[in-house]
Design a protein with these regions (language model features):
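A broad, low-specificity signal marking well-ordered, structured residues that form hydrophobic/aromatic
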Residues: 25, 71, 110
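Flexible, polar/acidic helix-loop-strand segments at domain edges
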Residues: 1, 6-7, 11-46
Length: 159
């Protein structure tokens, strides 16, 4: 079936090779392996937590110096020095840093919604632009069949 415990195998044979598929070079892999390679990515990272805290500080009118320190800690780790540090951060800089730091980690959609840029995304199909209801997902038919008290989210066809 491809499932092993709580993990999902890429192929039933476990035959995953360095050359297979698209691969982000963000995480290195053991080049001595010829198969059964691990290619997991992290769900939460310290950098993500720092950036979330910095965002919360800015959104709540908190300590900008602390928010700036947190973002710069992420940048210093990424660049290896303080040459790219910010003097001060705002939501736009934090959103940009999240794009750099968390690329390929499944944060983009929710980040764009939270920062109010989802409907402006250049990859969004023209027929969906300006339809704010698409910021939330529809309730699935399966969920509704389980609980018929659910009402479909606005903008989507009713059950």
């Amino acid at each position: 079936s491809g499932l092993v415990g709580s993990e999902m195998c890429i192929r039933d044979r476990g035959d995953v090779n360095q050359e297979d598929g698209a691969r982000c070079n963000k995480w290195t892999f053991d080049k001595s392996l010829t198969n059964a390679m691990e290619n997991d990515f992290h769900i939460f990272r310290l950098a993500d937590v720092y950036l979330m805290k910095a965002e919360c500080l800015i959104r709540t009118g908190g300590n900008n110096a602390e928010a700036t320190r947190l973002v710069n800690a992420v940048r210093e780790r990424a660049y290896g020095n303080s040459n790219h540090n910010y003097a001060s951060v705002d939501l736009e800089k934090i959103a940009l840093e999240r794009k750099f730091e968390l690329a390929w980690e499944c944060h983009a959609r929710q980040d764009n919604i939270r920062f109010g840029t989802f409907q402006n995304a250049r990859w969004l199909k023209s027929e969906t632009k300006g339809k704010d209801y698409m910021n939330i997902f529809p309730i699935s038919q399966d969920a509704w069949q389980t609980n018929q008290n659910l009402k479909q989210n606005p903008g989507y066809p009713a059950f």
